[in-house]
């Protein structure tokens, strides 16, 4: 039995999230149908992190076990031949049994692209979040500083979250304006369900001047979801990177397919 890892990219706007559903309109369903067509047998995938409806994947990683012996490029080309244009396998790599797409990962990175303009842009539909009023970037940075570190993030988890512990280590929140956009980078050991979107909702509320920067510390301390802002829209959220120990030599995510990749590359915590 061989363990194969795949790197996946997908347009989240085209699917009802990652996790398989009876209606079959999820990324996992599309991927497993295509793998079955290519391999002529059912293959079950395990994913690094489940994404919600509308959330995009640039650096998603899955693994599956199989008796089939195929070349790496064969898994890529063969599976892609049966996938819709909104999802594609980027790479395939044999892995040792010690590799696990979810449990071997030690960090995840999400980016959020936010369009700030009085009028929404149809060209950005499904690609970026949108607010119509200016935001105070310095206030959002001050607020974000209260969240970095190891904390109980219960105030930012959804009621449907199945995580065993609400304690996560948030390594970085980077915020950088770029013309009519503000880009956010969230890097942590793991995230709770809706955690990034709930953090975004609170940061935007601070940026709009509805709350002072210190409010985020109060929300965090409360551990109460009702104290935080509403969950922000999913459209601008991208799972960009999943980190694994060097021994697995997981290929890096290809971010060049998004127009903001050069801006994201500069989001290193000093901005």
From Swiss-Prot:
Residues binding substrate, per UniProt: 110
Domain of life (superkingdom): Bacteria
Keywords: Isomerase, tRNA processing
Enzyme Commission number, as recorded: 5.4.99.12
Matching InterPro entries: PsdUridine_synth_cat_dom_sf, PsdUridine_synth_TruA, PsdUridine_synth_TruA_a/b_dom, PsdUridine_synth_TruA_C, TruA/RsuA/RluB/E/F_N
Alphabetized GO MF terms: RNA binding; tRNA pseudouridine(38-40) synthase activity
This protein's name: tRNA pseudouridine synthase A
The species this protein was found in: Burkholderia pseudomallei (strain K96243)
Gene (UniProt): truA
